[in-house]
Amino acid sequence: MATLFDQAKLMARELQDSDEFKQLSTALAKVRADQEANSAFHDFQVAQKEIQELQSKGEEPKPEQIQRWQTTAQKAQQLKPIKDLSVVEQNLNNMLGEVNEIITAPLNELYLNN
């Protein structure tokens, strides 16, 4: 019998073969091919990472850091390749959420039945 980790590796391969993953790959390639979108996407990722790192240390971001993040997010969301990427990311996240519900169903049942 395969171990849980073997099953997880199989699921990772299945994820890569899914339409959602392929759509994400295509959408991301379109962002990278568009100089303006790629630059805006990069700026957003840098600003977001900066805030996340502070929060992971229990620190609050400075108002100017939050403003920079919001500004880069607004700029990025105005660009079609990034809008399209966001839709595809949401679809993939929905699928992963459903998979997570299936995987964790035994845990939920355990807590509800005891």
Curated annotation (Swiss-Prot):
Secretion signal, residue range per the UniProt entry: none
A Pfam entry, by short name: Com_YlbF
InterPro entries to which the protein is assigned, alphabetical: Com_YlbF, YheA/YmcA-like_dom_sf
UniProt xrefs under Gene3D superfamilies: YheA/YmcA-like
Similarity remark: Belongs to the UPF0342 family.
UniProt-recorded name of the protein: UPF0342 protein OEOE_0901
